[in-house]
């Protein structure tokens, strides 16, 4: 179902994320992308997504979709979590591997949380997807920071090594967007 008169506004500055969201959502909605600077609070991925969604809805004055991702390493008690981008920018993927080298447990969970708000004053709804894996030395090339070190459980390859179509059909982002799509299509059906 598309509705070009009422596009779904996705707030992100990440062009690769836009391509992935469009590929996964398909004709579910007409996407309009806005790159606006939003404050990011300190907190869990859910708290950050919820606050980002509220701020975006207030800023644009209408319905909005936002996303935040996290990488939770079990041996580190869930760190770096929602702060993975800052970790990768500061110490790189090799730095994350070095930190984890002191632990036997290399398991990790990729987490993607989308927030949707109907507009100012509406409580954001959250849609979360999780993908199990483990941290390995970097393999493959990716435009998403930590994908070369995240080996998907049962696949034997990192997200960066995976063919795009396959990745878009099993990723943490895919799982979150499937939940959003089901809700969105159900919410738009006439009563």
From Swiss-Prot:
Binds 1 divalent metal cation per subunit; can use either Mg(2+) or Mn(2+). CDD domains: HAM1. Its main location: cytoplasm. GO terms for cellular component: cytoplasm; nucleus. It comes from Aspergillus oryzae (strain ATCC 42149 / RIB 40). The keyword Repeat does not apply. ITP binds at residues 12-17, 52, 68-69, 85, 144-147, 167, 172-173. Pyrophosphatase that hydrolyzes non-canonical purine nucleotides such as inosine triphosphate (ITP), deoxyinosine triphosphate (dITP) or xanthosine 5'-triphosphate (XTP) to their respective monophosphate derivatives. The enzyme does not distinguish between the deoxy- and ribose forms. Probably excludes non-canonical purines from RNA and DNA precursor pools, thus preventing their incorporation into RNA and DNA and avoiding chromosomal lesions. It holds the Pfam family Ham1p_like. The keyword Cytoplasm applies. This is Inosine triphosphate pyrophosphatase. InterPro entries: ITPase, ITPase-like_fam, RdgB/HAM1. Disulfide bonds: none annotated. NCBIfam families: RdgB/HAM1 family non-canonical purine NTP pyrophosphatase (TIGR00042). It catalyses: ITP + H2O = IMP + diphosphate + H(+); dITP + H2O = dIMP + diphosphate + H(+); XTP + H2O = XMP + diphosphate + H(+). Belongs to the HAM1 NTPase family. Mg(2+) binds at residue 40. Keywords: Cytoplasm, Hydrolase, Magnesium, Manganese, Metal-binding, Nucleotide metabolism, Nucleotide-binding, Nucleus. It is found in: Cytoplasm; Nucleus. GO terms for biological process: deoxyribonucleoside triphosphate catabolic process; nucleotide metabolic process. Its EC number is 3.6.1.66. Its cofactor is Mg(2+); Mn(2+). One of its GO terms (molecular function) is dITP diphosphatase activity. Homodimer.
